[in-house]
Amino acid sequence: MNDKKLTILKAYTQAWNDHDIDTIMSMMADECVFYTIAGPDVMGTEHRGRDKVRAAFEAAWQNFPDAAWLDGEFFDLGGDKAMSTSRFKGTDLQGGKHEAQMVDLFVFDGNKISVKNAFRKNRPAISGD
């Protein structure tokens, strides 16, 4: 993998785990797009532009205050594309525990992420304890 992309994606994932929106947004291109894991459209829900992307990212922590992305692996797909896999783990606002494998597809604009397209297994909440 391109060392720069690898460095960016590792730092990006760490910023997600740190719930550090400012660091995350510093890695996003000015013209950025985020496609959520679910939504009414074929691509999920599209959030276009820094303000909308930021708000959508922050909603992840609002909905899952202890959200974590574990066991990250990173892949260079060639050109301006890359991919990461991780295991999402978090507790929703009703106390439901969630854990599922996920994939993020990225498009880079230079050294910034211009597109984050998220996919996660559709798994019901699991029992706690």
Predicted features, each with a name:
Residues M1-D30:
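Short, low-complexity N-terminal intrinsically disordered segments enriched in polar/charged residues
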Residues M1-K4, R54-D129:
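A beta-strand edge to alpha-helix "cap/lid" segment located at domain peripheries
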Residues I8-A15, R50, R54, K81-M83:
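Generic alpha-helical hydrophobic packing signal
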Residues D18-I21, P40, F106, K112:
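Preference for short coil/turn "hinge" residues that link or interrupt alpha-helices
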Residues T23-G78:
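A solvent-exposed, acidic/Ser-Thr-rich amphipathic alpha-helical stretch
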